[in-house]
């Protein structure tokens, strides 16, 4: 049975994000993946701090200075018979809810682990988020050109700490200066590594079969024997790859390689296009939407300000869930119940924009936004429904923002509200005074906010500590009790960027006592957009 042209396009799409701890090599992998997708001809090396060859996916000013990826960029490239959408997420020490929300827009994730260090803190946090939706995970053990931990130990650690079975697809031969290549367990082939080929796609020498004398000649008898011994162990002790279990998020195929040396990345990409799911169905508040439906639907998972310093604009990123986008089509923005014509949607190659004529499920569109689109907005061709599961998290860190020039209060508020709509930070306006408090998931966000207020809104601000330990969104079905709660706790109440009532607690003890005192009031840690 031949599929209709529309369904063929849907079946070709793969949408994934990379999750990792800072410095595990995520940006380098992104580069190499794009190199294989022929999207960039020579891969820009990330770190040379002053070098002009910046990695292609880190494009905001502050990222260029610090060598880290702060904003989620989107890149589309062809690979084999598929069209792959890669959503790049911030990888540095400190990241924002952007990262969490980006994971709601993908169908699959690649987990990158520094094989010298194993599972690290940020990887754990991000894996918890993918678990909420049982997202399928592929794993790349990176940095084999350095000395690494024992590969079996690494697999055990992933299984025990992240509660997901490991099915090795390739297996390393040596590491560090002795790294010779990898053996593919399912193809019975050894791929030999050559150094110094990191910037290009190399012709790899392949040796067929484990008992081939060529293997001993190529890697040395000791390493060849070690490989055979290890493989006996591996085949006895580890999981076989099982596609059903992979799609259920219970087992992860594991690849070994070095992104810097551009080796092993293609094996992982082959696995991605072969095994990762085509665009998946999504829940709304009324029904499940399937990718094969012909009517257009999509949701906004991120807003990015000023992608183009020349045009002080903001762009809303929308994941297409079903149907085909065509230039100039009419869509309904469900939250405000208004029909809009979208004639100038964008696709991205990190920072380079091109206008798009059509897009399919799994693709990410950029919509020009003049303040009317919010995170979590659903667009349809008229049906009134809302996609669910796009979270807002209660921040864990708080600072008061203070102006150096008090006359700029209006610009400051405008800047903070726009940054909060974008999800870069959350802003709270206490009811009892004129303070402006910002809340974030990580410390670096405060620096980002101050830098962006200055460069984009021309506002000089500083942040200082404030007596807030945590925040909760509050609501109550009993209006009378809610009024009493508001009257007695006015000092602790604030409005967030979307004018939702929030309780800002000076200590956790205060929060617990208040919750006990007002059992009818709900204190929420997350809020649906």
From Swiss-Prot:
User: What's the stated role of this polypeptide?
Assistant: Increases the formation of ribosomal termination complexes and stimulates activities of RF-1 and RF-2. It binds guanine nucleotides and has strong preference for UGA stop codons. It may interact directly with the ribosome. The stimulation of RF-1 and RF-2 is significantly reduced by GTP and GDP, but not by GMP.
Location in the cell reads: Cytoplasm
> Can you say what this protein is called?
Peptide chain release factor 3
Q: Which top-rank group of organisms is this from? A: Bacteria
Q: Which residues form a coiled coil?
A: none
Q: Which UniProt keywords apply?
A: Cytoplasm, GTP-binding, Nucleotide-binding, Protein biosynthesis
Q: In the UniProt record, does the keyword Plastid occur?
A: no
InterPro entries linked? EF-G-like_DII, EFG_III/V, G_TR_CS, P-loop_NTPase, PrfC, RF3_C, RF3_dom_3_sf, RF3_GTP-bd
Q: Name one GO biological process term.
A: regulation of translational termination
Q: Which PANTHER family does the entry link to?
A: PEPTIDE CHAIN RELEASE FACTOR RF3
Annotated Pfam families: EF-G_D2, GTP_EFTU, RF3_C
Residue stretches making up the tr-type G domain: 11-280
Tell me the organism: Citrobacter koseri (strain ATCC BAA-895 / CDC 4225-83 / SGSC4696)
User: Where would you find the membrane-spanning parts of this chain?
Assistant: none
Extract the SUPFAM superfamilies matched here. Answer: EF-G C-terminal domain-like, P-loop containing nucleoside triphosphate hydrolases, Translation proteins
Q: Which residues of the sequence carry a binding annotation for GTP?
A: 20-27, 88-92, 142-145
Q: Which family does it belong to?
A: Belongs to the TRAFAC class translation factor GTPase superfamily. Classic translation factor GTPase family. PrfC subfamily.
Naming one, the record's GO cellular component terms include: cytosol
Entry GO MF terms: GTP binding; GTPase activity; guanosine tetraphosphate binding; translation release factor activity, codon nonspecific; translation release factor activity, codon specific
């Amino acid at each position: 049975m031949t599929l209709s042209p529309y369904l063929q396009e849907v079946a070709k799409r793969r949408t994934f994000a990379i999750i990792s701890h800072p410095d595990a090599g995520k940006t380098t992998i992104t580069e190499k993946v794009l190199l294989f997708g022929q999207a960039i001809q020579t891969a820009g090396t990330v770190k040379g701090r002053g070098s002009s060859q910046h990695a292609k996916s880190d494009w905001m000013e502050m990222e260029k200075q610090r060598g880290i990826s702060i904003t989620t960029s989107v890149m589309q490239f062809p690979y084999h018979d598929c069209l792959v959408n890669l959503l790049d997420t911030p990888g540095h020490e400190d990241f924002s809810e952007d990262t969490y929300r980006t994971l709601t827009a993908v169908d699959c994730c690649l987990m990158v682990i520094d094989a010298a260090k194993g599972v690290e803190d940020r990887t754990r946090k991000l894996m918890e988020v993918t678990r909420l939706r049982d997202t399928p995970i592929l794993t790349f053990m990176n940095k084999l050109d350095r000395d690494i931990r024992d590969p079996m130990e690494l697999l055990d650690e992933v299984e025990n700490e992240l509660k997901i079975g490991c099915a090795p697809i390739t297996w390393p031969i040596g590491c560090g200066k002795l790294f010779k290549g990898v053996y593919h367990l399912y193809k019975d082939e050894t791929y030999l590594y050559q150094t110094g080929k990191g910037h290009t796609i190399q012709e790899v020498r392949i040796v067929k079969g484990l008992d081939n004398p060529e293997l001993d000649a190529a890697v040395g008898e000791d390493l060849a024997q070690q490989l055979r011994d290890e493989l006996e162990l591996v085949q006895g002790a580890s999981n076989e790859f099982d596609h059903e279990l992979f799609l259920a998020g219970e087992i992860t195929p594991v690849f070994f390689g070095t992104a810097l040396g551009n080796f092993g990345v293609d094996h992982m990409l082959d696995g991605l296009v072969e095994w990762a799911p085509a665009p998946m169905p999504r829940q709304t508040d009324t029904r499940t939407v399937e990718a094969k439906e012909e009517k257009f639907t999509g949701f906004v998972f991120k807003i990015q300000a000023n992608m183009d310093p020349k045009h002080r604009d903001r762009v809303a990123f929308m994941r297409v869930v079903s149907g085909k986008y065509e230039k100039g089509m009419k869509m309904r923005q469900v939250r405000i119940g208004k029909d809009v014509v979208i004639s100038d949607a964008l696709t991205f190659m990190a920072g380079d924009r091109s206008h798009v004529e059509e897009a399919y499920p799994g693709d990410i569109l950029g919509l020009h936004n003049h303040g009317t689109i919010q995170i979590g907005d659903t667009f349809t061709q008229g049906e009134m429904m809302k996609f669910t599961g796009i979270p807002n998290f209660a921040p864990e860190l708080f600072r008061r923002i203070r102006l150096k020039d008090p006359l700029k209060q209006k610009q400051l508020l405008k800047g903070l509200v726009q940054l909060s709509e974008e999800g870069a930070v959350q802003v709270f306006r206490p009811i009892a005074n004129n303070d402006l408090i910002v809340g974030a998931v990580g410390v670096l966000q405060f620096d980002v906010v101050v830098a962006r207020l200055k460069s984009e809104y021309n506002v000089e601000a500083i942040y200082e500590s404030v007596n807030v330990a945590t925040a909760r969104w509050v609501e109550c079905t009993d209006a009378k009790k809610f009024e009493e709660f508001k009257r007695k706790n006015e000092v602790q109440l604030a409005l967030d960027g979307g004018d939702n009532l929030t309780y800002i607690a000076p200590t956790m003890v205060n929060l617990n006592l208040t919750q006990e005192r007002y059992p009818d009031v709900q204190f929420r840690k997350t809020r649906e957009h």
